[in-house]
Curated annotation (Swiss-Prot):
GO terms for biological process: adenylate cyclase-activating G protein-coupled cAMP receptor signaling pathway; aggregation involved in sorocarp development; cell differentiation; culmination involved in sorocarp development. It is found in: Endoplasmic reticulum; Vacuole. The keyword Signal applies. It comes from the Eukaryota. The keyword Transport does not apply. This is Differentiation-associated protein 2. The gene is dia2. It comes from Dictyostelium discoideum. Coiled coil: none annotated. Keywords: Differentiation, Endoplasmic reticulum, Signal, Vacuole. Has an essential role in the initiation of differentiation. Also required for cAMP signaling. GO terms for cellular component: endoplasmic reticulum; secretory granule; vacuole. InterPro entries: Diff-assoc_signaling. PANTHER family: APC REGULATOR OF WNT-SIGNALING PATHWAY-RELATED (PTHR34261), TUBULIN POLYMERIZATION-PROMOTING PROTEIN (PTHR34261:SF1). Its main location: endoplasmic reticulum.
Length: 151
């Protein structure tokens, strides 16, 4: 419950910040559906807890890893990164997925974060983090890939 309150508080604060300064990033809903599973109601608290544990620096790690060090039924994995763009304008995209734990893990949310987001200040980094958290929730609800892209 504390994690949910913290997430809501963060989103509210960032919406206020967005009023006073230009946003460095935005959400993009793609048409791409991922082959995942609908999150069972009993796992919803674990999902919210894991999303709440996300940190800005972990969004941009290349190492494939459980970036939230989950103990519950859901984990958030860094699935690696890949390049996009043309030769002179290549950039990295970081592939993050919320998955069920266990032998036959299934994706329940899929988010990509572009490394071309220019978040220099703590406020801008908090904005990007809040967008990533929102992207996980929207992806879980829609079954679609969400991207956090430069504004």
């Amino acid at each position: 419950m504390k994690q949910i309150i913290r997430l809501i508080t963060t989103l509210l604060l960032l919406s206020l910040i967005g009023i006073t300064c230009a946003a460095v990033a935005k959400l993009h809903e793609t048409d791409k559906k991922f082959k995942g599973v609908e999150l069972p109601e009993k796992f919803l608290d674990d999902f919210n807890l894991e999303v709440g544990k996300l940190q800005y620096a972990n969004l941009f790690r290349s190492k494939k890893d459980d970036i939230t060090h989950s103990a519950g039924e859901i984990r958030i994995d860094q699935q690696g990164s890949f390049s996009r763009g043309e030769k002179k304008k290549k950039f990295k995209v970081y592939n993050l997925q919320a998955q069920t734990n266990g032998k036959s893990s299934k994706t329940v949310a899929h988010v990509e974060v572009f490394d071309t987001i220019d978040a220099k200040t703590k406020a801008e980094q908090n904005e990007v983090l809040a967008l990533a958290k929102e992207a996980f929730t929207k992806s879980k609800d829609s079954g679609k890939l969400y991207q956090v892209i430069p504004n």
